[in-house]
Amino acid sequence: MVNNETDTREKGVDMWTVHDRYGNKIYLTAERWHHILESRPELAAYLDELLETIRTGRRKQDMLIPNEYRYFKEFDKLLPENNHLVAVVIFKTRLDEMGNSVPNNFVITGWAKYIVPKR
């Protein structure tokens, strides 16, 4: 695991934190992971890949919700039904204990999908 990320599964904390390729700290809570699995149980074996999607995947900003980004990454192991994982991240700020505005970026959902390769 890369030094700039935390995998807290072994520590009993209900959150995974990674940094995207732009240096943004983003977290996925156990509650959100369970939300994803409620409607997409086939993703249960792909937590590491979902985190990798955020770390190294491409992203697109939502045109109507400018603080929402969709991260995409291709994974051959999802074939034949799907070939990409998608993670939706909300970028916000919150006040820390000193009253300073700090980033509060988090995953709200994710899914697998087939994206036709461009020719």
Q: Residue locations for each model-derived region?
A:
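Ribonuclease/tRNase effector modules and their secretory precursors
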Residues: 1-119
